[in-house]
Amino acid sequence: MSRYWSDIVQQLVPYVPGEQPALAHPVKLNTNENPYPPSPRVVAAIARELGETGDTLRRYPDPVARALRETVATHHRIKPEQVFVGNGSDEVLAHTFQALLKHDRPLRFPDITYSFYPTYARLYGVQTSNVPLADDFSIRVDDYLDDAGGVLFPNPNAPTGRALPLADVERIVAANPSSVVVIDEAYVDFGAQSAITLIDRYPNLLVVHTTSKARSLAGMRVGFAFGEAALIDALNRVKDSFNSYPLDRLAQVAAQAAYEDTDYFNATCRRVIDSRTRLTHALDALDFNIVPSAANFVFARHPAHDAGAIAAKLKEREIFVRHFRLPRIDQHLRITVGTDAECDALVAALRELLA
C-alpha cells in the first residue's frame, strides 16, 4: 500500500487469474484454454496482414472493426450495428458495468460465478446482490423474476459448468424489462443454447461472447457483445472515452478468419465435447462427484480427499488444475478438458494419488 493510492484502489480486491506455469511441457488444465490450435486460416490471415515487412503495423487499426463485425453479424444472422467488439470479453464486461449496470438498484448475480464480476462491481461502484445457487449448483430461475435490478450470469455458469435451457433464460429476460440482463456466453459453444436469437425481441438483453475458448484465440484477446443498437451505442460511448483502438490489426483479421472457418470450429467443439464425456467417465470411475457440464471443463469433488491437497500434489507432477478457496466450492476442482493424452495423464496421476 502507498500513500499515493486512491481510496478506490485501497479497497479493491483484484481478480486472480489462473497460474501460467513457466514450464516446458506442463499438463495445463487450469485456465480453460482450448487444447487445439486455431484454424489454419487464422495463421494464414495473420501472415497476409503482416506481409514481408510488417508495414501495416505502423498504421492504426480500424477503430470499429467493421469487417470483423460484419462477418460475425452474418454468422449470427443479426445486423452489424448489433455487434460490439472489445479487447477480450473481460473488457467488454468492464464497459458493460460502466455503461449499463450502474443504477439505483443492485445488480444480481449468482453467489458462485465468474469472480471478475464482484471485482468490476467494486471498481465501478456498482451495488450488487449475490443470489445463492441451489444445492446442485443450478441457477434457480424464480430468484430472478421480480424485476428488482440488473441481472448478470454466465451460461454455462463458471466455474460449475451448469447451463440453463434457453426457455429459462428467456423467462428471466422477459421478467426484467426495466433492467439490462447480461448473459455471459464464454462457454456456450460446448453444449448450451445461445440467447443471441432473442436480442431482436428483448431490448434489455445483452449477450457477451469470446474467441478465447471455442475458437482457440485466448492469446489474441477478442470479445463481443450482442444486443439492440441502443445498448451497443452505450458500449461504444464508453469505449471511445477510454480507448478508440482496442483491437489491433492482427487480432481483427485473426478473429475474422476464425469465424469464417465454421467447419474447423464445429469439428474442434465436437472433439472437446467428446473428450469431456470421456474425462467425466474416467473421473466417475475414480469416485469423483461431477457436476453436469456444458462447458469445456468439469467441476468435480472427491468425497474422501481434500481438493486443495489433490491440486498441490498434481502440481508437483506438473499437472495444473484450478482450486478455489471459496465458500461452498473449496472441495471442488475445476478441470479443463485437454487433449485425450493430457486427460489420460491427469487420470493416471489421480489414480496413483488416490490409491
From Swiss-Prot:
GO molecular function: histidinol-phosphate transaminase activity; pyridoxal phosphate binding
Modified-residue entries (N6-(pyridoxal phosphate)lysine), positions: K213
Entry EC no(s): 2.6.1.9
Top class in the EC scheme: transferase
Cofactor(s) the protein requires to work: pyridoxal 5'-phosphate
Any Pfam family: Aminotran_1_2
One record GO biological process: L-histidine biosynthetic process
Stored SUPFAM superfamilies: PLP-dependent transferases
Alphabetical keyword list: Amino-acid biosynthesis, Aminotransferase, Histidine biosynthesis, Pyridoxal phosphate, Transferase
HAMAP family in alphabetical order: HisC_aminotrans_2 (MF_01023)
UniProt similarity note: Belongs to the class-II pyridoxal-phosphate-dependent aminotransferase family. Histidinol-phosphate aminotransferase subfamily.
Subunit-structure text: Homodimer.
Stated name of the protein: Histidinol-phosphate aminotransferase 2
Organism: Burkholderia lata (strain ATCC 17760 / DSM 23089 / LMG 22485 / NCIMB 9086 / R18194 / 383)
Lineage: Bacteria, Pseudomonadati, Pseudomonadota, Betaproteobacteria, Burkholderiales
The gene coding this protein: hisC2
